[in-house]
Amino acid sequence: CALPIFPVIPTVHYNMGGIPTNWKGQVLNPTQKDENKIVNGLWAAGEAACSSVHGANRLGANSLLDIVVFGKACSENISEICKPGDKIEECDIQQLNNDILTNKNYLSRKGDLNVADIRLEMQKTMQKHAGVFRNDKLLEEGVKKLSEIYKLFDRVSIDDKSNVFNTEYIEMLELKNLLDNSLITMHSANYRKESRGAHSHQDYPERDDKNWLSHTIAHLNNGNVILSKRNVIRKVLDDDVKAIPLAKRVY
């Protein structure tokens, strides 16, 4: 008898990166003068954060390190800094109001595109142009295609306008986050001219520690991606454990 054929393809289950943090979970905003500049009052842990422990290819089961170790580190650091009776620092109320208004407008705006169609185009573009094996041509084309798809989000609207249990609205917010993440990923992959860890570049098959032993720092503003580098942390906190020297990953 004939059996149905099921396609088997690779897909994403982990992001090799995230919000830059130090080992205490404090969020960093790297600058040219200070690549370890701390954002006061903001912490991140788990798979959303990048504390420079995984390198370019996380080993299996090491997500527990993100969650358990750095989750605990965050709580300990917060308890050290924040004391009972401390006042919350003043914040930019106008910026907060702008963010709230932007998200509210998603409910009311009218458009000619739906979430599912844009999400599918984004998925196809990422699968084709930022898949397991990459090259300059694919990545450059991917940057252009994804930039166009990113702009289409402004034409997306939803039918459900309610404020309670609105799954359409949740999917719309998820799409915005996915587009942000995808655009940064595509630009960052095109930026890195080497092969390292999960980034396998056919035009640059070797690892290049001289030029690319660094994190890629990406800032996204209205669809424009600005990229820079941040040094990889190679120093240990104490003398009990020695730093592991660089070596080729072979099997």
What positions do the PLM features span?
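Short Gly/Pro-enriched turn/cap motifs at secondary-structure boundaries
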Residues: 8-11, 16
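Proline- and acidic/polar-enriched loop/turn elements at helix boundaries
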Residues: 6-7, 205
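Glycine- and aromatic-enriched mobile tails/lids
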Residues: 14, 26-44, 48-251
